[in-house]
From Swiss-Prot:
CDD domains: HisRS-like_core (cd00773). One of its GO terms (molecular function) is ATP binding. One of its GO terms (biological process) is histidyl-tRNA aminoacylation. It catalyses: tRNA(His) + L-histidine + ATP = L-histidyl-tRNA(His) + AMP + diphosphate + H(+). Gene3D superfamilies: Anticodon-binding domain, Bira Bifunctional Protein, Domain 2. This is Histidine--tRNA ligase. The keyword Lipid metabolism does not apply. It is found in: Cytoplasm. It comes from Methanococcus maripaludis (strain C7 / ATCC BAA-1331). HAMAP family: His_tRNA_synth, HisZ.
């Protein structure tokens, strides 16, 4: 007999795990809602042309790609930003700005599963479209930070700006391909590869750029880093403008952070401020990434629109938070014996409690009372209402506290007070 297994890189979530995920999801949603972001969702699959628009066909090996019955090439979404850009152009381009959206959904990447990395995973993120003001960048950073504070997660945020190194590349007349190669090596933290690439470029162009690049990468710290780097890059006008932009953003960020210009972000569409947030769990440290991408909407044939956003890796957040117990608030209603009259009374009681917002389970197995109580105990249900013939005729039921074992009679009219 075949025993079917879940696909490689996917997970089944047991009820206890789902309860914990729902608790964290609810707290993060609370923060998004408090900033008046509106929730959306997009199709699970999009055209491959959309998904590969920025990166080109080389992304094919990282996606789940298929053809529909009309021979159109489709792919399961690997993230949401491209889909949201398409959605914005379709539905929101004439909406008053800024457009503030958030989402929580599953994404798919065809890669080797490992700790904190799956083929199906969940992202929760935001996109703020229509404002190029520093305070818009700050709002997104603050929201990302406050979400993690809301769930009591220990973390560290690193903030940088792609324009600083880009200004250095421009000064030394590097091509876009050369600049992107260096960025990708920085993003991979491949220092040997970076040194080799810089040495090759220096030899080909007869320039000395390595020292300046590593000056930028090595300087990390608080806001004072900006003034120090402005001195070192005094002749690099574009870099100075990027540093001033970052300084204007940080004016509105009242949280602890580390300035780090080694943040390159793996996706090529970022254009300005970038940030990453790290937890403490080895192998799953990065829990959030984001930044500004002012050219993305235009790339998808929309009107030029500045944009900034971020995404949480929800699964990595779950790996980084301390384990916790979810308090059970459910109530079990059971008749002393199985009879239509008592079952109807149980249904009435359950209906009253459910309408008041309580989670109620009825005994659906016709168990004897002792076995019904054992079932409730096994499920961790702390309150059991026992419905007996004599008690119900007097307008009463028995309430049993499963933690203490205490049992008392209560009036039906007081049922909502339990």
């Amino acid at each position: 007999m075949i025993m079917f297994q879940k696909p490689k890189g996917t997970r089944d979530f047991l009820p206890e795990e789902m309860k914990k995920r729902k608790v964290i999801e609810k707290k993060l949603r609370k923060v998004f809602d408090s900033y008046n972001f509106s929730e959306i969702n997009t199709p699970t699959f999009e055209s491959f042309e959309l998904l590969s628009k920025k990166t080109g066909d080389e992304i094919r090996t990282q996606l789940f790609v298929f053809k529909d019955h009309g021979d159109r090439e489709m792919g399961l979404r690997p993230e949401l930003t491209s889909s949201v850009a398409r959605f914005y152009i379709n539905e929101f381009k004439n909406t008053p700005k800024p457009v503030k959206l958030y989402y929580f959904t599953n994404c798919f990447r065809y890669e080797n599963p490992q700790a904190g990395r799956y083929r199906e995973f969940w992202q929760m993120g935001s996109e703020l479209i229509g404002s190029n003001k520093p305070i818009a960048d700050a709002e997104v950073i603050n929201m990302a930070i406050e979400g993690l504070k809301e769930i009591n997660m220990d973390f560290e945020i690193n903030i940088g700006h792609l324009g600083v190194l880009k200004g250095v590349f421009e000064k030394y007349d590097l091509s876009d391909d050369e600049g992107n190669e260096i960025r990708r090596l920085i993003d991979k933290e491949d220092m040997d590869g970076l040194k080799s690439a810089l040495n090759r470029i220096e030899s080909e162009k007869n320039i000395e750029i390595s020292e300046k690049v590593f000056e930028v990468l090595d300087l990390k710290g608080g806001r004072e880093v900006i003034s120090k780097l402005k001195e070192k890059l005094a002749e690099f006008e574009s870099s100075i403008a990027a540093l001033e932009n970052l300084d204007s953003i940080l004016e509105f960020v009242p949280h602890e952070y580390i300035i780090n210009f080694g943040i390159a972000r793996g996706l090529d569409y970022y254009t300005g401020m970038v940030f990453e947030i790290y937890g403490k769990r080895e192998g799953a440290r990065q829990v959030c990434g984001g930044g500004r991408y002012d050219n993305l909407i235009e790339l998808f044939e929309g009107e030029p629109s500045p944009a900034v956003g971020f995404a949480y890796g929800f699964d990595r957040i779950m790996l980084n938070i301390d384990d916790f117990e979810v308090e059970e608030e459910s109530i079990f209603v059971v008749p002393v014996k199985s009879s239509d009259m008592l079952l109807n009374e149980c249904l009435k009681i359950a209906k009253t409690l459910r309408e008041a917002g309580k989670a109620v389970e009825l005994d659906l197995m016709g168990r004897k009372l002792n076995k019904a109580l054992n079932y409730a105990n096994t499920k961790g249900i702390k309150k059991v209402i026992i419905v007996g013939e004599n008690d119900i005729l007097e307008g009463k039921v028995a309430l049993k506290n499963m933690e203490t074992g205490e049992q008392s009679l209560i009036e039906l009219k007081d049922i909502l007070t339990i």
